């Protein structure tokens, strides 16, 4: 359990810094709720916790850690691309429409994802913490 691990680390004098990588509650979660037939990347059984910026701040404060560096990033727009592509295939729409969708969105993926990352609404975060 994450709380138990943080509690142990808090009292370990050999630990000064901590690096974590956690999945976050992001756009991908909503896409998975709307597309139950498409493979779930965020909500699958391997992830027992999804965090928000607020929940991470709360738990770090509780256990005596402060953020010294963070990198918010994700594949939410790739997930959006995948979910829409799968849905288009299932609707048996024209192949031309599927090709057009793929052509149009590919060049936008990085810019769209960057905006989500800037708002800390992406599917992952890597954080370096310092014990205070």
Give residue ranges: language-model regions.
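Active/binding-pocket-proximal capping segment
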Residues: 14, 38, 74-76
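A generic fold-level signal
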Residues: 13, 43, 120-122
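Active-site rim elements
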Residues: 44-46, 115
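Conserved SAM-binding loop
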Residues: 1-35, 48-65, 124-132
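Short, flexible, glycine/charge-rich loop motifs used to bind or transfer phosphoryl groups or to couple energy/partner
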Residues: 9, 37-39, 116-117
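Short glycine/proline- and charge-enriched loop/turn segments
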Residues: 33-43, 84-91
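A C-terminal cap/extension of S-adenosyl-L-methionine-dependent methyltransferases
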Residues: 71-132
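Short, well-structured beta-strand/strand-turn elements
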Residues: 66-70
């Amino acid at each position: 359990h994450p709380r138990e691990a943080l509690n142990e680390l808090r009292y370990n004098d050999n630990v000064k810094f901590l690096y974590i990588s956690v999945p976050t509650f992001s756009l991908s979660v909503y896409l998975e709720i709307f597309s139950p037939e498409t493979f779930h990347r965020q909500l699958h059984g391997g992830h027992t916790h999804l965090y928000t910026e607020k929940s991470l701040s709360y738990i770090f404060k509780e256990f005596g850690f402060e953020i010294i560096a963070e990198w918010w990033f994700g594949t939410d727009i790739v997930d959006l691309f995948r979910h829409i592509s799968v849905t288009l295939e299932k609707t048996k729409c024209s192949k031309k429409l599927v090709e057009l969708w793929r052509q149009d969105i590919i060049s936008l993926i990085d810019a769209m994802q960057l905006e989500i990352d800037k708002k800390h609404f992406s599917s992952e975060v890597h954080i370096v913490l310092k014990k205070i």
